[in-house]
Amino acid sequence: MLSYLIFALAVSPILGKIEIVFPQHTTGDWKRVPHEYNYCPTSADKNSHGTQTGIPVELTMPKGLTTHQVEGFMCHSALWMTTCDFRWYGPKYITHSIHNEEPTDYQCLEAIKSYKDGVSFNPGFPPQSCGYGTVTDAEAHIVTVTPHSVKVDEYTGEWIDPHFIGGRCKGQICETVHNSTKWFTSSDGESVCSQLFTLVGGIFFSDSEEITSMGLPETGIRSNYFPYISTEGICKMPFCRKQGYKLKNDLWFQIMDPDLDKTVRDLPHIKDCDLSSSIITPGEHATDISLISDVERILDYALCQNTWSKIESGEPITPVDLSYLGPKNPGVGPVFTIINGSLHYFTSKYLRVELESPVIPRMEGKVAGTRIVRQLWDQWFPFGEVEIGPNGVLKTKQGYKFPLHIIGTGEVDSDIKMERVVKHWEHPHIEAAQTFLKKDDTGEVLYYGDTGVSKNPVELVEGWFSGWRSSLMGVLAVIIGFVILMFLIKLIGVLSSLFRPKRRPIYKSDVEMAHFR
């Protein structure tokens, strides 16, 4: 409830039409969010231009990340362990666990080959190996692969995926945020100039209201495909036989109007870019953070981190919490949703979209600055009595609700306050390992990163007392067995003496027997 109050106080009530950023896709290629992933977006650039006047400028850029992706495989490795705890004071106790293990390139290539040949096989947990008075581990090194496609940066040819360290990778083998997982592909990428270029509506901001001020301090530019960015330090750079400009954040665009382009190109303060310059696509953090108010930035970050903290600690989250994770500016970024109690994502390009209100009867919106009305989304998942889509958007009987934008309008209802517990993606072998456990009433637990049995001598004694019932029964069994054994030995001795023939005493007068003495 505190997060609702903070956000309501921080923003002005939104009445009527609203402008948001929304994924360009209408459905997602969903994947589970990795455990170490912790993305928080930059604050919205809505007021970054302050009182500057906007001048419409038609731009062109390489086509967005709508179709460009490359196929590959995630290679997962784990140590599957069966632990036998057969201490002298207790009964035999068996546990199963899996542990992170970094795969080798050779292991992964062999696993990928087996997968393609249709002969991949998971043997499961190794058989137990028990020795009296010991704790023994039986180990199996298991490597599996799963198909996993990633997006492609049209400018650099780099692979883009939240699993990669830093979100990007170049090459046929990529490290991931999981130390037990690598990504493999046989693709060399595509030629960056094979992309189609698309027109985008842009606005140049300046106090002087003149295009000739481009490149000077206190000027900036934004479009439906990227957030407000300062034009100070802009330089001229050709790309794929097209004359264009590179901003200081390495974003490239071309001005379509020949007269405007010539005016800007002839400005003396706009120089040619260095020959070694590189360019990138609008990324997840493209906003110039120095232009965003500290209060808004800190508040957005705190609300986002609060959501990740809830997920990490297993606390329930609401659609409003989930909406804090979504990007606030146009460009490439992750889309989040909840599927079967797990947090999922996919990567899309965000566009500026205008909505009639935070609750709409049809899932449609108008691309900002145009007359184009488009279907926004068409994939929903169960969430209590309603359905949930991207970044907390809800499909209800009353219409489609955008929780983040309902806050502060007086329309807050029970739908956007529904809570559900969601989980990270811990290790891909966990789900498979569950199928190898017993399905009886023993309630066997699968341990991750720990065998569930301590080998520390002090903790062994503590374990004796923590499991005192089973340990006591084991000790009593040993004592009773020892007593029974002693009784049997004594009984055998008694019976032996009873059935042994008695020796007749020999007297000296017995001449015949005395002869043998």
From Swiss-Prot:
Keywords tagged on the record: Clathrin-mediated endocytosis of virus by host, Disulfide bond, Fusion of virus membrane with host endosomal membrane, Fusion of virus membrane with host membrane, Glycoprotein, Host membrane, Host-virus interaction, Membrane, Signal, Transmembrane, Transmembrane helix, Viral attachment to host cell, Viral attachment to host entry receptor, Viral envelope protein, Viral penetration into host cytoplasm, Virion, Virus endocytosis by host, Virus entry into host cell
InterPro entries: Rhabdo_glycop_CD, Rhabdo_glycop_FD
Transmembrane segments: 475-495
Residues flagged as site, Involved in the interaction with host LDL receptor: K63, R374
Residues with glycosylation annotation: N179, N340
Chief place of localization: virion
Disulfide bonds: C40-C304, C75-C108, C84-C130, C169-C174, C193-C240, C235-C273
GO biological process: clathrin-dependent endocytosis of virus by host cell; entry receptor-mediated virion attachment to host cell; fusion of virus membrane with host endosome membrane
Compartments it resides in: Virion membrane; Host membrane
Membrane topology (Virion surface): 17-474
Record-marked site positions (pH sensor in the pre-fusion state): H76, H178, H427
GO cellular component, one term: host cell membrane
Signal peptide: 1-16
Record Gene3D superfamilies: 2.30.29.130, 2.30.30.640
Modification comment: Glycosylated by host. Palmitoylated by host.
Membrane topology classification: Single-pass type I membrane protein
Location of the region described as Fusion peptide in the Swiss-Prot/TrEMBL record: 53-172
Biotech use, per record: Used to pseudotype many virus-like particles like lentiviral vector, because of its broad spectrum of host cell tropism. Also used in viral vectors studies in cancer therapy.
Pfam families in alphabetical order: Rhabdo_glycop_CD, Rhabdo_glycop_FD
Subunit comment: Homotrimer. Interacts with host LDL at target cell surface.
Function: Attaches the virus to host LDL receptors, inducing clathrin-dependent endocytosis of the virion. In the endosome, the acidic pH induces conformational changes in the glycoprotein trimer, which trigger fusion between virus and endosomal membrane.
Family: Belongs to the vesiculovirus glycoprotein family.
Protein name: Glycoprotein
Organism this protein belongs to: Vesicular stomatitis New Jersey virus (strain Ogden subtype Concan) (VSNJV)
